[in-house]
């Protein structure tokens, strides 16, 4: 009895902000607790369900019975919002143990830490860093030191970004607004960690990289030729698919392949005309203000393309032309289907509206109405005309995952945000740097093996970073002459050289190669960065 009472201890203030007498709050809290494995403390799976389980065979072992770092940290943060810091600490410790040697995290894994899918999602590297920061700020670390985990994670971000192999919908690679939002926030948290530890060099390097992402964000993820809403050509896209690290393709001309669509239907679309609401994460963490004209214009497009008004309240689809969901005839998703509306996106929109100073009652009420008969929130709801024979009703559950822990966490965080009068996930250090006292962009371009930026402008600094010490041998005149630059080390294992470009002639080339000091080997090939016009 005492053990259950400890697990059920939560912030009773939040009941006052529920509109259903606290039923969903109570159910959400217990649902999140139930998703922790009992033999592997801190291991939270995404859902106790198997989506469209009635159509699945024994060969589909994973289902949603896996740990996704993104879903898990959202679960832990939902519990933290409810006043529970002990369970989120177990989650952080589990993630620290599951972290890869290179600082990254697997896309998902079994509760014992063994990987299942091995894709790279850079937001999933960022989320554990933000959880560590939140627990530290809340005084909930209880002697556990996440510093090594945090620094390894941000070193991984710096050496493997800014292109993510997969974004939060796990289907596309490129520049993702939601991924970059998480990266910027996590890097800023880590810079704060390093500064507090007295490592000013690492703190500055980490923050410089966060600033670099922020200063390039619109160049990478905003179209100026969108066609989805007349009169609004400029908005954030879902993702800018980049095929070649050596040559960033212009977003306005890029094409995006969309998964889960039948071969008989169009599968390749112009990236500028595919949107989701992932850019709202920029407001959630404090990278952009809620009243940004670009954010507001992007919302106009999202509402015109993705919003669904159901009898139970407003809901949003993930992105246009999504194929992950119940089929049009009501049949189960079997590799193809139609993406339906996701209640967790109603919660995300509620957080934006709160940040904008608006009433969030409609979003709290909608989430409470989206619950199933068993009191749980689904991943998706039916978003078109009723099909009674298939038990599908507009605003009602589908065969998608139910419960979805992430959706329950989003509801709890929305209650907490309403109680506090500010977004619970907002990070003060991020707000201070990018909203309250915005910094001028440094004239810096970053190059590393996974991000071989092709150009640098006159009067900029080209910063070359690597995960080991090196000598950079560089020529500005086609190897008639060369200079040798030893790298500078940092406390996070990232080494770097800064090359001032000065008044270089546009069109000129920088040629360089590496001698790796510890291994005493030459890279064996040259690299080129051109001086931009």
Question: Which residues make up each language-model segment?
Answer:
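Glycan-association/targeting regions that enable binding to alpha-glucans and other polysaccharides
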Residues: 426-533
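Aromatic-rich carbohydrate-recognition surfaces in CAZymes
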Residues: 62-163, 176-180, 184-190, 408, ...
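Long, well-ordered core segments of solenoidal/helical folds
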Residues: 28-40, 83-106, 145-166, 208-228, ...
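Structural helix-adjacent loops and short alpha-helical linkers that scaffold large soluble proteins
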Residues: 13-22, 39-42, 79-92, 134-151, ...
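Acidic/polar, glycine-enriched structural segments that form the non-catalytic walls/loops
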Residues: 1-63, 426
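Extended ligand-binding clefts on enzyme/binding-domain cores
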Residues: 9, 15-24, 121-122, 178, ...
């Amino acid at each position: 009895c005492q053990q259950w009472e400890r697990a059920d201890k939560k912030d009773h203030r939040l009941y006052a902000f529920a509109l259903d007498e606290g039923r969903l709050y109570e159910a959400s809290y217990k649902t999140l607790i139930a998703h922790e494995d009992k033999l592997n403390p801190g291991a939270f799976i995404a859902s106790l369900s198997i989506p469209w389980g009635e159509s699945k065979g024994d060969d589909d072992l994973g289902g949603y019975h896996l740990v996704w770092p993104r879903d898990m940290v959202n679960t832990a943060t939902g519990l933290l919002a409810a006043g529970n810091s002990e369970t989120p600490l177990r989650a952080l410790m589990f993630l620290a143990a599951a972290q890869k040697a290179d600082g990254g995290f697997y896309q998902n894994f079994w509760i014992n830490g063994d990987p299942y899918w091995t894709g790279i999602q850079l937001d999933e590297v960022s989320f554990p860093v933000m959880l560590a920061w939140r627990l530290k700020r809340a005084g909930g670390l209880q002697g556990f030191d996440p510093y090594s985990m945090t620094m390894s994670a941000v070193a991984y971000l710096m050496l493997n970004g800014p292109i993510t192999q997969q974004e939060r919908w796990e289907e596309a690679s490129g520049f993702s607004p939601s991924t970059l939002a998480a990266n910027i926030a996590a890097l800023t948290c880590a810079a704060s960690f390093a500064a507090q530890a007295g490592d000013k060099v690492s703190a500055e390097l980490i923050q410089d990289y966060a600033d670099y992402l922020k200063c390039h964000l619109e160049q990478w993820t905003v179209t100026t030729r969108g066609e989805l809403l007349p009169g609004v050509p400029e908005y954030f896209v879902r993702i800018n698919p980049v095929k070649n690290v050596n040559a960033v393709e212009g977003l306005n001309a890029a094409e995006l392949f969309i998964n889960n669509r039948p071969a008989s239907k169009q599968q390749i679309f112009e990236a500028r005309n595919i949107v989701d609401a992932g850019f709202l994460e920029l407001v959630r963490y404090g990278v952009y203000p809620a009243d940004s004209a670009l954010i507001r214009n992007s919302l106009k497009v999202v509402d015109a393309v993705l919003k669904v008004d159901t009898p139970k309240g407003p809901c949003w689809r993930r992105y246009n032309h999504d194929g992950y969901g119940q089929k049009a005839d009501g049949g189960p998703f079997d590799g193809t289907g139609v993406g339906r509306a996701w209640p967790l996106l109603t919660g995300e929109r509620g957080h934006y509206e709160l940040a904008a100073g608006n009433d969030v009652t409609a979003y709290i009420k909608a989430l409470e109405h989206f619950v199933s008969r068993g009191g749980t929130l689904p991943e998706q709801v039916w978003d078109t005309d009723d099909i009674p024979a298939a038990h599908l009703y507009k605003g009602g559950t589908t065969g998608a995952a139910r419960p979805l822990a992430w959706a329950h966490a989003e509801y709890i965080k929305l209650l907490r945000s309403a109680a506090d009068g500010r977004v619970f996930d907002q990070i003060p250090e991020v707000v201070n740097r990018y909203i309250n006292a915005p910094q001028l962009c440094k004239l810096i371009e970053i190059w590393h093996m996974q991000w071989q930026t092709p150009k640098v402008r006159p009067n900029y600094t080209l910063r070359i970073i690597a995960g080991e010490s090196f000598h950079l041998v560089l020529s500005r005149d086609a190897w008639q002459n060369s200079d040798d630059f030893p790298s500078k080390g940092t406390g996070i294992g990232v080494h770097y050289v800064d090359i001032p470009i000065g008044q270089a002639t546009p069109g000129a080339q920088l040629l360089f190669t590496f001698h790796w000091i510890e291994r005493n080997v030459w890279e064996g090939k040259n690299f080129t960065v051109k001086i931009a016009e």
